[in-house]
Amino acid sequence: MFAEYGVLNYWTYLVGAIFIVLVPGPNTLFVLKNSVSSGMKGGYLAACGVFIGDAVLMFLAWAGVATLIKTTPILFNIVRYLGAFYLLYLGSKILYATLKGKNNEAKSDEPQYGAIFKRALILSLTNPKAILFYVSFFVQFIDVNAPHTGISFFILATTLELVSFCYLSFLIISGAFVTQYIRTKKKLAKVGNSLIGLMFVGFAARLATLQS
């Protein structure tokens, strides 16, 4: 399938993409958290931020920016530390709000929804490993002798985004159902928020220690 467009072993790629999307990461965790705290609208706004951020990174990977980042340690480190700092900021903010007893059932006005989208977008864009991954993974399924490898890259990128959309939709719908349950279980909600905050801090530490 899509061999005429320079895509190799598409079905193998699809299976690989599914497994990759299922691996827990800060993006999926952020979407799940917002679907629980802000409902389906908050979850899908977070997902939109992730989709757009990923699309930008995929385009940069195709444009050759990934090679520049990989061969320029200082550039890689700048993006890496920015990403780690932002993850630490999000984790600390969640932990602080939980410890102070702030209730996530607070008003869900438009500025809050806008902030969710922006945070998700920044979270996605400040992951230098993602852009390097897209190159190393996609190149295995692209015929370098094809006349238009950009089309091949687009097909693979679109497939990954569609798989991600399906999985994040599942998380968002599940999170919305969980919201109805934890509204009457405040202690459980606090424990859940604390764990999410700690996981973001853990992701920050892992990103800060990654090498290009």
From Swiss-Prot:
GO MF term (any one): L-leucine transmembrane transporter activity
Keywords: Amino-acid transport, Antiport, Cell inner membrane, Cell membrane, Membrane, Transmembrane, Transmembrane helix, Transport
GO biological process, one term: L-leucine transport
Main location: membrane
GO CC annotation, single: plasma membrane
Catalytic activities: L-leucine(in) + H(+)(out) = L-leucine(out) + H(+)(in)
Subcellular location(s) per record: Cell inner membrane
Transmembrane segments: 12-32, 49-69, 71-91, 122-142, 153-173, 188-208
Membrane topology: Multi-pass membrane protein
InterPro entries: LeuE-type
Domain of life: Bacteria
Annotated family: Belongs to the Rht family.
NCBIfam families in the cross-refs: PRK10958.1
Functional description taken from the UniProt entry: Exporter of leucine.
Entry protein name: Leucine efflux protein
Protein's gene: leuE
